[in-house]
Amino acid sequence: MLAAAHGAVLVPTVPPTYQALRQEVDRLGNAEARMCFYLSALFTATDQIQRYLSAGIPVVVESYFARCLANHRAFGANLSVSLPQGLPRPITYYLACAESERQRRLARRDKPVSRWDALAEINADKITDAYASFPMHRVTTTGLTPDEVLQAVLSTDPQGEQASADTQHVAAHPHLLPSVPRRTEGAYGA
């Protein structure tokens, strides 16, 4: 919905060529191996994202490096990751809702619960705390329909102050991507 509203392309952060291996990696219990797999998928998706951006085509993704790092740290991965310069820098929205609403939405999902989903539930507070260190626009979605959530996201000023974000200058932290693209023409190549 967001991609259509922005005239953007929705890019999967786990590319189709990764899907079969994704199932195998997800079956394993190794958080570090899983984190490395998802980082590889993200770097591969980033190549495609950059091609679109270089052509002037906006891009939407459902998750990016912040999710990978926050979740896997909460899952127990103990890898130190420094993201390279030059990655596309997203405007990130953190969709939040009341716990009762979150539980209701989880119960209505039509997919089996994986061990990683269960681990995410056990570590939900750790994941939320980890997200707080990333620059994001918090959008409260409690009681909203998908169309209303879309309107709430679209009405958020992407360059405004972010109440839930750490205000430390993003360049000072090696794991964070700034929320506002800072790209000069040709800075990332063609």
Which role does the model predict for each range below?
Residues 1-2, 153:
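Hydrophobic residues on the short alpha-helix immediately C-terminal to a glycine-rich phosphate/catalytic loop
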Residues 84-98, 104-152, 173-178:
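Small-molecule kinase domains that catalyze NTP-dependent phosphoryl transfer to phosphate-bearing small molecules
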Residues 2-47:
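Conserved substrate/cofactor phosphate-moiety recognition/catalytic segment
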Residues 45-111:
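ATP-dependent NMP and nucleoside kinases share a basic, alpha-helical "lid"
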Residues 35-40, 70-72, 115-117:
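Short, flexible loop segments at the rims of nucleotide/cofactor-binding pockets, characterized by
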Residues 5, 55-56, 134:
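Structured helix-beta-strand junction loops
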Residues 151-190:
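C-terminal accessory "lid"/substrate-recognition subdomains
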Residues 16-18, 67-68, 146:
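Positions that flank functional sites
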